[in-house]
From Swiss-Prot:
Family statement drawn from the similarity comment of this UniProt entry: Belongs to the GTP cyclohydrolase I family.
Biological pathway: Cofactor biosynthesis; 7,8-dihydroneopterin triphosphate biosynthesis; 7,8-dihydroneopterin triphosphate from GTP: step 1/1
InterPro entries on file: GTP-CH-I_C/QueF, GTP-CH-I_N, GTP_CycHdrlase_I, GTP_CycHdrlase_I_CS, GTP_CycHdrlase_I_dom
Molecular function, one GO term: zinc ion binding
Organism of provenance: Listeria welshimeri serovar 6b (strain ATCC 35897 / DSM 20650 / CCUG 15529 / CIP 8149 / NCTC 11857 / SLCC 5334 / V8)
Recorded superkingdom: Bacteria
Name of this chain's protein: GTP cyclohydrolase 1
Gene that specifies this protein: folE
Length: 189
């Protein structure tokens, strides 16, 4: 994928500053356009990545019971307003035939999918679909909780509100006991 055009972003930020009545040449703002461009390069770094590659290496451990990585901190940018949202992801899967992934790979997939203009609902679904496709588990359950700045600093102005999304696949979809186990473990500190 082609690199992010930082100069084009910096030029656009300068235009925005002028449009809101600011002087982009004043002391506090003179370097802001390029700072924003470098920030966008970082927060949109997932655009240049294929998150599914994290499951290219699978281990045969003969573990066929629940695996849960919880409280994976993430941040993303709302594609509607280009303001951040952030929170935690909880990712569970039920291995099939003992096929397991390195635990850090679950967090890496969440990061790569999050680091692009995005919707929380899409992150949740995409992580679950990648895991089902590449890891081939009996089931996957992804729950994400996030605070959205588009609800906190504008519009409805409701700081502290959380949005919770879930994607439930395979065995978790049809087994209430298994789903309840994941939810109980997420609540457990």
């Amino acid at each position: 994928m082609e690199q992010i055009d930082k100069q084009k972003i910096a030029d656009a930020v300068k235009v925005i500053l002028e449009a809101v009545g600011e002087n982009p040449e004043r002391e506090g703002l003179i370097d802001t356009p390029m700072r924003v461009a470098r920030m966008y390069e970082e927060v949109f770094s997932g655009l240049k990545k294929d998150p599914s590659i994290h499951f290219d290496t699978i281990f045969a451990e003969q573990h066929e019971e629940l695996v849960l990585v919880k409280d994976i901190r993430f941040s993303s940018m709302c594609e509607h307003h280009l303001v951040p949202f952030f929170g935690v992801a909880h990712v569970a899967y039920l291995p099939q035939n003992g096929r397991v992934a390195g635990l850090s790979k679950l967090a890496r997939v969440v990061d790569d999918v999050s680091k692009r203009p995005q919707l929380q609902e899409r992150i949740t679904t995409t992580v679950a679909e990648i895991m089902m496709d590449k890891l081939k588990p009996l089931g996957v359950m992804v729950i994400m909780e996030a605070e959205h700045m588009c609800m906190t600093i504008r519009g409805v102005n409701k700081p502290g509100t959380k949005t919770i999304t879930s994607a439930v696949r395979g065995a978790f979809k049809n087994d209430d006991k298994l789903r309840s186990e994941v939810l109980a473990l997420i609540k457990h500190n």
